[in-house]
Amino acid sequence: MIQYQNDQITIFESQLYKTTSTVIQTEDCLIVVDPCILPAEVEEIRDYVTSVRGSRPVYLVITHSDWDHVVGAGAFPEATVVASAAFQSKNPEEILEQARVFDDEYYIDRKTPLMYPKADVVVEQDGLRLEIGNTALTFYQAKGHTDDGIFAVVEPLGVWIAGDYLSDVEFPFISSSSADYIETLEKTETILANHRINLLIPGHGHAAFSQEEIL
């Protein structure tokens, strides 16, 4: 279902875990974030992108390697993929097997292939900036929940893609380290100081529309 939509931003919400997938339109490109989870949901996102894309390039941002965030990547084979350097070092087969186990348990068939995307743009440090015409994406490493997470800030819209952090519904699961998690949360002040954030989108739960909600 669509959790939120305006002329440039559409937030899709899965029936599972309140997982969000985001499509951002600018005059320069389409940005797709973590398309997931169920086949019909992934197809809805793909069909929406196809309907509005025109001749614009598609950028696929994968915030981290949890299977539920990569399961829909195969629906966008033409996209330029952005992910962290640590994401690239994972064992793809292990992560895809988690998705297969889920699908087998619930008798799920997918029309789009399960694939672990290879990053075309690799985030290795905070502040990496990707400029596409008048659209700019700034990336930050976001370790703690996993060791391969990233934040993305999309400007001039002021959208902060937060991955599995700053959720209003999800317990803060830590699979990397608590020190990493704290360091990632401490980047909140830096991001808010360096960017005018109008909308924060967590990987699970509801979007926040003010700094008061974010903090």
What are these regions (language model features)?
Residues 23, 126-153:
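Core dinuclear metal-dependent hydrolase active-site scaffold
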Residues 33-35, 57-66, 82-85, 141-143, ...:
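Active-site neighborhood of phospho(di)ester-bond hydrolases with catalytic His/Asp-centered motifs
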Residues 38-40, 65-71, 88-90, 147-149, ...:
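Active-site environment of divalent metal-dependent phosphoester hydrolases
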Residues 41-129:
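Active-site HxH/HxHxD metal-binding segment of metal-dependent hydrolases
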Residues 182-215:
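Divalent-metal (often Zn2+) His-rich catalytic cores of metallo-beta-lactamase-fold enzymes
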Residues 1-47, 151-164:
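Conserved beta-strand hairpin/beta-sheet module of binuclear metal-dependent hydrolase folds
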Residues 36-37, 95, 171-176, 212-214:
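Short, solvent-exposed loop/turn segments at secondary-structure boundaries
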Residues 141-181, 185-190:
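Active-site-proximal loop/helix segments of hydrolase catalytic cores
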